[in-house]
Curated annotation (Swiss-Prot):
Heme b b562 binds at H83, H182. The keyword Lyase does not apply. It is found in: Mitochondrion inner membrane. Keywords: Electron transport, Heme, Iron, Membrane, Metal-binding, Mitochondrion, Mitochondrion inner membrane, Respiratory chain, Transmembrane, Transmembrane helix, Transport, Ubiquinone. Binds 2 heme b groups non-covalently. A ubiquinone binds at H201. One of its GO terms (molecular function) is ubiquinol-cytochrome-c reductase activity. It comes from Akodon kofordi. This is Cytochrome b. The gene is MT-CYB. The chain crosses the membrane at residues 33-53, 77-98, 113-133, 178-198, 226-246, 288-308, 320-340, 347-367. The lineage of its organism: Eukaryota, Metazoa, Chordata, Craniata, Vertebrata.
Length: 379
């Protein structure tokens, strides 16, 4: 079996990736979230496949087909709620995974980091088009508002919006193409995830100390397969608690009402995992400026390798930047809260302050704190 594992053309790839892979002996539970994201993706693809068997992407029947899945399909309610809450678990793992990458300096592996940013953007796109499919009030108005942002692009904006809508408003053509995108994107994400792993295994994984771990490696199996299994069981436990006891806690009550183009909800807002970016978008009075800030809020992640001027790897021995990092995390939570609030005083002002702080921490404060710590080392 050992000879086959090491020599077989296909098994050899699996062996080098998940069995005999040399791994740093000191990586903590924060490194579990990569495997948890893989697990989330598998859950989403499987539950999504079963939902697609019963869903109809037509404006007249989409809402009814989701109700039919919940009422008439065997365990349809469970599949639907696993899929909806699975998306939330996916984004929780994603935010922690990115947060760990920032804290421990994983952005130094620039190819892996940049493919990760592409994966993040594709996951956000998939979640957005997926949210439109149940064709409730928030689905319809969320799609209308977010796609309409493209009209801020000079010259081609209006044409581009109508091209994406497939008409002069969000309608049947939009729903059909969004379903097609939502079906195909997870498979593209899976392919990119393999490329992400490929680049990671080229350089080897980072570790909490930020030091070179070539002299102290252990095989991935059985040490980290066991550790990953524990993480997967805990993830499934939280997901099942959400799906079985609090299935609608992360959803929007407006989505229980079928889409009505003649009735606008009081507060249009996306799913909770987009609220931080939505808050940044709303905090700028100018439409084009808001769209640029929205894009920048994600693409700013690509600046981390460029702005890093520290002589140390990761934040483990850098108390000044650690404080700034946790302020950044708290600021992100404030933005998420503000994104779900109405556009009125004092929420608008808090949103503007938090948006400026978000960008200032990454572009100004972190490089300054790095310089301070570099000078402390010289003392």
């Amino acid at each position: 079996m050992k000879i086959l594992r090491k020599n077989h053309p296909l098994l050899k790839i699996i062996n080098h990736s998940f069995i005999d892979l040399p791994t740093p002996s000191n990586i903590s539970s924060w490194w579990n979230f990569g495997s948890l994201l893989g697990m989330c993706l598998m859950i989403q693809i499987l539950t999504g496949l079963f939902l697609a068997m019963h869903y109809t992407s037509d404006t007249t029947t989409a809402f009814s087909s989701v109700a039919h899945i919940c009422r008439d399909v065997n365990y349809g309610w469970l599949i639907r709620y696993l899929h909806a809450n699975g998306a939330s678990m996916f984004f929780i793992c994603l935010f922690i995974h990115v947060g760990r990458g920032i804290y421990y300096g994983s952005y130094a592996l620039s190819e892996t980091w940049n493919i990760g940013i592409i994966l993040f953007l594709m996951t956000m796109a998939t979640a957005f088009v997926g949210y439109v499919l149940p064709w409730g009030q928030m689905s319809f108005w969320g799609a209308t508002v977010i796609t309409n942002l493209l009209s801020a692009i000079p010259y081609i904006g209006s044409t581009l919006v109508e091209w994406i809508w497939g008409g002069f408003s969000v309608d049947k053509a939009t729903l059909t193409r969004f379903f097609a995108f939502h079906f195909i994107l997870p498979f593209i994400i899976a392919a990119f995830a393999l490329v992400h792993l490929l680049f990671l295994h080229e350089t080897g994984s980072n570790n909490p100390s930020g030091l070179n771990s070539d002299s102290d490696k252990i095989p991935f199996h059985p040490y980290y397969t066991t550790k990953d299994l524990l993480g997967i069981f805990l993830l499934l436990l939280v997901l099942m608690i959400l799906a079985l006891f609090f299935p609608d806690v992360l959803g929007d009550p407006d989505n229980f009402t079928p889409a009505n183009p003649l009735n606008t909800p009081a507060h249009i807002k996306p799913e909770w995992y987009f609220l931080f970016a939505y808050a940044i978008l709303r905090s700028i009075p100018n439409k084009l400026g808001g769209v640029l800030a929205l894009i920048l809020s994600i693409l700013i992640l690509a600046a981390f390798p460029l702005l890093n001027n520290s002589k140390q790897h990761g934040l483990i021995f850098r108390p000044v930047t650690q404080v700034i990092y946790w302020i950044f995390t708290a600021n992100l939570l404030v933005l998420t809260w503000i994104g779900g609030q109405p556009v009125e005083y004092p929420f608008t002002m808090i949103g503007q302050i938090a948006s400026i702080t978000y960008l200032a921490i990454i572009i100004i404060l972190m490089p300054i704190s790095n310089t301070i710590e570099n000078n402390i080392i010289k003392l």
